[in-house]
Amino acid sequence: LTATDGSTVEFYDEIKAQGGVKDVYFSVDKTYVVAFYRKAINANDKARINDIVNIHRNRIFTSDAVGQYWTAFFAWPTKIVEWKGLTGIVIPFYDKKFFFDGIDPSWPFIKNGQEKNGKWFSSAKLINKFVPVNQKGTFLSRLHMCLKIARAMRRLHAAGLAHSDLSYNNVLVDPLSGNACIIDCDGLVVPHKFPPEVVGTPGFIAPEVLATKALKVDDPKKNLPQI
């Protein structure tokens, strides 16, 4: 396929993973994935994606050392494609450190190749029960991991963006190296331009948003995720 920027995108015509609204295909060289929205998206969503892929990506990930520093913090969409009447986005393949490796085959809870999403490491109880000793990292490495999550969100907010669906599943972590990566960045909120599509995930919802959760989306009294 030819992306909107004129570059070539190659992938296998086989769905490898599915999310809530997208089907994911692997590229031929496995350096990126192509995620197609299962249903046709409206003009507002197309404009949002275009701004995220072009305007905001170029502002955050500049060519200097500072811009390149942030590339490890986000799985940011890099291109837009159209195929069979559907819109898709090209996303860099997650770094291998964000997949479990070295798990004993007899371990019942986690298997090699699973994503290291934040849920596994969100409490001492979960870590001690489900995570093998060789995957836990140290207190210091987990502290570095948490600092990088906070740093990534602060950078988003500094760019005038907000992640409306932050959750355990949308943060990949690696307590061994102390790294973290924010994913699902194609639905970011742009204040006064692109409103949030979801209220958020329980446990991650701001108090003022939770207080008006029962109200309809178009109710002027409803608080939605924003900066």
Briefly describe each language-model feature range.
Residues 1-48, 52, 68-76, 82-84:
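ATP-binding glycine-rich phosphate-binding loop
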Residues 144-146, 153-175:
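Catalytic-loop of the protein kinase fold
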Residues 183-189:
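Activation of the activation-loop gatekeeper triad in protein kinase-fold domains
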Residues 178-179:
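Generic structural signal for coil-to-beta-strand starts
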Residues 33, 90, 182:
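Short hydrophobic-acidic sequence motifs that mark active-site Asp/Glu residues
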Residues 195-218:
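Conserved activation segment of eukaryotic-like protein kinases, specifically the C-terminal portion
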Residues 226-227:
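A conserved short alpha-helix in the C-terminal lobe
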Residues 72-141, 194:
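Conserved structural core of kinase catalytic domains
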